[in-house]
């Protein structure tokens, strides 16, 4: 008794039964017009005009014709094979059980659906439609290749005696149509009908398992694996498919066990393992396996090289990449392979060797679109935007290739950055015109573009309209929020994504939204910005559970998050646990110690970094100078500045000069800072250095140099509000209220708006935001009342408000009211009222903490007996028992 397939459904009949055949005079395919003359005269005339060789071959036997037909199919002369069949029909030679399978194979390889249907009608006419299982199996294959799932099922359902080939054809077809569950159901029915599976069956079934979501796919895959072991069917073909399945499902340990236990490892086996390792970001291990493969005497091919080169690219292992390039050059024409060429271009560009990438590109004769895309992306990621756009134009105009979604992923960022491309949004119109606007890859790129242009609302609109969002889409939108400093929105979107992922794990969806390393390294800066320590710890726990905590990018982000949430000890612990530290990791930990005022530890880390063979870069020294500045280590900072080129090989840039100006200015050595400004190379951008000098002038009330710095800054950066605010502060402190008012008026006329002071504090699962002078928070009235009470207690302890921080020329009591509404005071009050006694209060602020808030927080910490950690835009302040960790040096 046959097994009723679980996926049975009703379809309209698309194949006429013999009694319903249409007359052959209708709906003819051009090939078959010759085979259906209306009279003997037309028969001869058609034959003479279309195939004069027929008269020569009329004496040939039917067997000769059928052998001729089959030989043409074997020789891949597909169209000639069809014409041979036409000649047979004209001569009245009846096709048999051997002719139709060969003919149907030819039509399947041609992927000609219309011709296939006509031949199918002939099959019924000559009586092979139901009883000949061989012909029926070939028909299944025909409709699979022509992409007609309904026809595949219909033909299969009418096979009276299904054999192994019938089931193999069906299961293979279902996999081709990505009907993975149905393929497994068909496999079960095959077993129920006592049809013995072959190795080809198991390959298709394992492929189906690899495309099911976890844990279902893994469970089914293991069952098929066990079945193969029991039946002794595990040949190299199946082993390779199992290795690929375990790798795709993230079970690399099982892939490696299979590889180790399999004696007949061939090139395909190795390539499968290498590909799985790279897909699962086990890049160093992939390179180790490549070495083992070569030692076993297995020569890499183009698939090996193109699979492993991305590992060199991501790890920036230029030397290994060059070795693979040399191997490709040495071994035949591997370097001429388009996939290898594209991978080489990507590797060189990712290692900042753009010229080497271009040489590979120029040396390729067969430049497919993948190669063009790799070179455009290489230029774009290295910010060679002009070259990227020129190459894009050349690809379309000279090479005649049309841009696809991958092309646009490289072109769009180049357009956004390029000064020559003023109408940035016009690229969106180009995408729509090319019909690429519904492509998910392109939509992700457009979302990123609008985020970087500051139009996060348009990015969100694109995201909202997308029907098919994958993990990359969610990561892109989260990145957009983080880039635009919409940190609360980024965390909310992550929460929404996690809720959808829970539905995925319950089988409600097939698209996995499980956060990966990119998700974590993207969202952790938002936790840091909001000082959301609890959320950061939650993400850290997830990273540990999913073996992502030791990833260098995730690890570096965790180091930064803990440091910016005030947990320097935990930051160092995470740093020490990262197995492969890169220069970014070292820079982050040095910056962390600097933010906390531990300058000597930062310098010790610089030395340790050198001992471990990691060369410092430009950012390293910015971190070191910042650490020296916040710790008052002026002489040590100057010493490092003057030896950074001879001892470390790093040329001082404008950013380094700005840091050293800050170092000197913060220490009150403003004239020296001004002299250093004048020593800067003429072509350097001096905005950063002038800004440091202006800030120092504000701290030390140096009106003369402050005015010079502000005038130069406003000329260089007329739209930056902080320059006007600092100058107005200097004038206010000096009692020059008219000048302060004039600065504010100029600021207003220029359309420059001061960024409002914002502070954040985490409580429970929420991050609460406070804005200076804002009363929209639900506890606003309660907080104001508490601060008034606290104010009186502080006065009794000797607190005198520093009203020099108020820019407005108003009465002293009004200035005090304005000071009381500063955002950090509101956040601290919220923390005191909403947490239990003894709990550390952690607050983050978007601007530099003012003198009065710094003074007030010292008094508050003593009165309420709380430790208060306040992070402003520059550094950390740890208040305890009336003192601050900065020693009033900030």
Curated annotation (Swiss-Prot):
Residues 796-890 are annotated as: Type DYW motif. Belongs to the PPR family. PCMP-H subfamily. Involved in RNA editing events in chloroplasts. Required for the editing of a single site in ndhB and ndhF transcripts, which are two plastid-encoded subunits of the chloroplast NAD(P)H dehydrogenase (NDH) complex. Required for the editing of a single site in psbZ. Required for optimal activity of the NDH complex of the photosynthetic electron transport chain. PPR repeats lie at residues 61-95, 96-130, 132-162, 163-197, 198-231, 235-265, 266-300, 301-335, 337-371, 372-398, 404-438, 439-473, 474-504, 516-550, 551-581, 582-616, 617-652, 653-683. It is found in: Plastid, Chloroplast. Disruption phenotype: No visible phenotype under normal growth conditions. The keyword Cell division does not apply. Residues 765-795 are annotated as: Type E(+) motif. Keywords: Chloroplast, mRNA processing, Plastid, Repeat, Transit peptide. GO terms for cellular component: chloroplast. It comes from the Eukaryota. The keyword Transit peptide applies. Residues 1-44 form a transit peptide. Its main location: plastid. InterPro entries: DYW_dom (IPR032867), E_motif (IPR046848), Pentatricopeptide_rpt (IPR002885), PPR_At4g14850-like_plant (IPR046960), TPR-like_helical_dom_sf (IPR011990). This is Pentatricopeptide repeat-containing protein At3g57430, chloroplastic. GO terms for molecular function: mRNA binding; zinc ion binding. It comes from Arabidopsis thaliana. It holds the Pfam family E_motif. NCBIfam families: PPR (TIGR00756). Residues 689-764 are annotated as: Type E motif.
